[in-house]
C-alpha cells in the first residue's frame, strides 16, 4: 500500500506504510503529532502526542506524560480518508516519514493552505 495525497485531483503518491501527521495548535502554539499506519486499505491511528497542554487541549484519560509530552493511544476506528481543512490563518501540516518531517504542501507539490485528503492507494 501507499499513501495518496489529493487536493481535488491526485497530487502525490508516497510509497510508505506508516507516517506521522503533525501540526501546531492555532491558539496555544503547541505541537500535536499523530502516528498513522496503512493496513487493509484504511488509515489506522496508532498513537498521538501533545507537546504540552492548554485551553481545550486536555489529554484524554489514560494519557501518560513523558518529558513534557502527553502520549496516548486513541480508540478510534480506522478511516478510509483523512480530510484536512487547511487555513491561511494557521501553519501548514507536516508529514513525517523516512525520518524526516516536511510541510504537507511541499510533499504534495500543491499550494499551501489548500484542503487535502489522505487515503491509502
Predicted regions and their residues:
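N-terminal secretory signal peptides
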Residues: 4, 8-59
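Mature, soluble, non-transmembrane domains
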Residues: 59-121
Amino acid at each position: 500500500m501507499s499513501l495518496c495525497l489529493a487536493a481535488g485531483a491526485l497530487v502525490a503518491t508516497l510509497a510508505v506504510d506508516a507516517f506521522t501527521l503533525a501540526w501546531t495548535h492555532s491558539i496555544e502554539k503547541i505541537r500535536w503529532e499523530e502516528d498513522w499506519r496503512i493496513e487493509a486499505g484504511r488509515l489506522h491511528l496508532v498513537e498521538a502526542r501533545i507537546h504540552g497542554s492548554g485551553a481545550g487541549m486536555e489529554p484524554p484519560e489514560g494519557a501518560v506524560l513523558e518529558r513534557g509530552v502527553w502520549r496516548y493511544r486513541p480508540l478510534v476506528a480506522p478511516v478510509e480518508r483523512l480530510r484536512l481543512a487547511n487555513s491561511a490563518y494557521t501553519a501548514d501540516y507536516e508529514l513525517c516519514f523516512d525520518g524526516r518531517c516536511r510541510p504537507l504542501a511541499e510533499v504534495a507539490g500543491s499550494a499551501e493552505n489548500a484542503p487535502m485528503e489522505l487515503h491509502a492507494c
